Amino acid sequence: MSTDTIKRYPMPMPFGWFAVSYSDELAPSESRAVHYFGQELVLFRTEAGKAVLMEAYCPHLGAHLGHGIHERSGTGGGRIEGNNIVCPFHSWKFNPEGECVEVPYAKNMPPKVAGKKCLKSFPI
């Protein structure tokens, strides 16, 4: 299929399962930026070994969670701490369900994220 055809007739959001990576391509505590279904996503594996696919942009200031900062993550991808992915800008932590579980410099969780699912996660 040509690039022009794909641009004119983009694939709609699929119903069903699609392979975005092989399991052995993602080690524990590793992440990578991926682009599927017309959107930027982050694919990561928790330290416990659970694979997670979720929206890529932090709701705070829009940092891409899959790019990270090389010096901090060691891989160039987003930093993983336990079961959470950490925003490279201000270290907000998100669990595999997309909930913000920590804002390190705040005494209380900001109302924008307190008890809310901030990022859409996709079943794997």
PLM feature segments, named:
Residues Y22-I124:
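Rieske [2Fe-2S] iron-sulfur-binding domain
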